[in-house]
Amino acid sequence: MIYGIGTDLVETSRITRLLEKYGERFARRLLTDEEWPEYAKSMQPAMFLAKRFAAKEALAKAFGTGIRHPVSLSHIGVTHDTLGKPYFKFHPELHTLVQNEGITRHHLSISDELNLACAFVILEK
């Protein structure tokens, strides 16, 4: 049974402006410690952050809460399996919410094209 669906679309130029204005502080607020090494190696930092932001915002929409504790940017990690399929890694506090809501599976799709990053999330009970 579907618990929630969320999607988000981010213009990379918006992320570029935030990086120019706030620098590394912006990236630190958006990423988990586990995401940081991949970001540091990225050849396109604005696109990397745009895709991460879109994924995290889409998850917040699927929860129906928006970005608010414990569904916060720093509590949502995005990683991928050996084939490149993206998935979420939840901070323990967020993981507790996932369990309490009876969410058993999540699906994440991320795409980008030129100046846009898009993410789609389905949460299942």
Curated annotation (Swiss-Prot):
Keywords: Cytoplasm, Fatty acid biosynthesis, Fatty acid metabolism, Lipid biosynthesis, Lipid metabolism, Magnesium, Metal-binding, Transferase. It catalyses: apo-[ACP] + CoA = holo-[ACP] + adenosine 3',5'-bisphosphate + H(+). GO terms for molecular function: holo-[acyl-carrier-protein] synthase activity; magnesium ion binding. SUPFAM superfamilies: 4'-phosphopantetheinyl transferase (SSF56214). InterPro entries: 4-PPantetheinyl_Trfase_dom, 4-PPantetheinyl_Trfase_dom_sf, ACPS, Ppantetheine-prot_Trfase_dom. Its cofactor is Mg(2+). Disulfide bonds: none annotated. GO terms for biological process: fatty acid biosynthetic process. Its EC number is 2.7.8.7. Transfers the 4'-phosphopantetheine moiety from coenzyme A to a Ser of acyl-carrier-protein. This is Holo-[acyl-carrier-protein] synthase. It comes from Nitrosospira multiformis (strain ATCC 25196 / NCIMB 11849 / C 71). The gene is acpS.
